[in-house]
Amino acid sequence: MDKLIPDNVLPYPLPPWEHDYRVLAVFGEVEEAPLQPLVPPPLKLCSSTVQISVMYFDSSVPTEPYYDAAVIADVEYGGIRGGFWIHGYTSTDLVHAGTREIWGYRMKRGDDWSLGGDGEHYSGHVARRNKRLIDIKMTVTGKEFKQPKLFPRLFLKLIPHASHAQAALKKVVVMRAETTAVTVDLKGEARLSMAPSLQDPVADLAPVKLLGANYIEGHQVLPWAEEVDV
């Protein structure tokens, strides 16, 4: 650990984080009107295609396994195109704090999770306040479809002053997740449901057209990232 950060102060480990992962994702086109305002400057929206996913990480760093779920937009900054988490949910306090403070993820806690399948059918969901915000059911067909380039991840890491309404820290973070192995990569068709919620308006980005779905397993490292002052 950097000795500028006293030992035992942070409630999470510093990068690199490492895990085996499982991801169930559906890709779709959404209305641009509700999507555009959710992409903060200086990031720029590249298309109206989003990824909506439920993920499970059998993690070695941190040591506790966890779930994530997200709506990820296709954005660009400084000639770099990647994925920005419009909405994000996770299952542990440690990941909630660590991903926000290190890389700038936008996270809330999810209350109820599932992700599984049998090689032909897969399903996954996240619920919060008794509402299934994302519920995906996929049937494996092998049908190919066009996917946007959503790696690297692009985040706006913003922390406000405690004394007034201005940013104490504001940077674009380019995080190049290192996928070292992909052991399962299945494509198919999906059904997606998104429960309306005033507190969690994920359903405002329900796709008007589904493009396809995939289920992936592999191994990944979340490294230190590049920070750009804005």
Predicted regions and their residues:
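Interaction-surface and assembly-scaffold signal
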Residues: 1-7, 101-230
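N-terminal domain-onset segments
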Residues: 1-66, 193, 201-205, 215, ...
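A broad, low-specificity signal for short, low-complexity segments enriched in glycine/proline
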Residues: 13-14, 30-37, 45, 84-85, ...
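Intrinsically disordered, low-complexity regions enriched in small/polar residues
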Residues: 14, 19, 23, 58-59, ...
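Generic structural motif
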Residues: 30-33, 57-59, 76-80, 129, ...
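Generic preference for flexible, low-structure residues
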Residues: 42, 51, 61, 68, ...
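Aromatic- and glycine-enriched beta-alpha-beta binding-site module
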Residues: 57-137
